[in-house]
From Swiss-Prot:
It comes from Caenorhabditis briggsae. GO terms for cellular component: RNA polymerase I complex; RNA polymerase II, core complex; RNA polymerase III complex. The keyword Phosphoprotein does not apply. Keywords: DNA-binding, DNA-directed RNA polymerase, Nucleus, Transcription. SMART domains: RPOL8c (SM00658). This is Probable DNA-directed RNA polymerases I, II, and III subunit RPABC3.
Length: 148
């Protein structure tokens, strides 16, 4: 689908390992199944609770439009996006930092940091899997729990 810059299945390895900081937010540490990526993400656990060993699909996209065109830049309550209906949890945010491991080797590690209204995400793995990320780009996060 157009506009998707990352798509993989993740498994929750731990929940709030450093203790719970906020009443309605949990920090999840997850591992990807296909691309060997590490994900740390804050999620409103009151709206979308996850527990250890839960599996979910994570999609990161630059637009919700199926045709891949950029969004209008303002909220339209009449707009219908079929992409949203396929997922259970959706957030909108911005990439605020990209960080490499400075090892100087080909295919090194890269970490992309994004904020979704203060809920933070770090996605880390091989740089080739994060080539579509840029600092200050707008980003949609879409999640759906899976059974397998």
């Amino acid at each position: 689908m157009a506009g998707i810059i990352f798509d993989d299945m993740f498994s929750v390895k731990s929940v709030d390992p450093d203790g719970k900081k906020f009443d309605r937010v949990s920090r999840y540490f997850c591992d990807a199944e296909s691309f060997k990526m590490e994900l740390i993400i804050d999620i409103n656990s009151q709206i979308y609770p996850l527990k250890q060993n839960d599996k979910f699909r994570l999609v990161l996209a630059t637009t919700l439009r199926e045709d891949g065109l950029a969004d209008e830049g303002e909220y339209d309550p009449k707009a219908e996006y079929p992409r949203i209906k396929q997922y259970e949890y959706v957030m909108y945010g911005k990439v605020y930092r990209l960080e490499d491991d400075d090892s100087g080797t080909d295919g090194g590690q890269l970490a992309a940091y994004a904020s979704f209204g203060g809920l933070l995400m770090r996605l880390k793995g091989e740089a080739i899997n994060l080539h579509g990320f840029e600092v200050d780009m707008n980003l949609y996060l879409l999640m759906k729990k899976t059974d397998f």
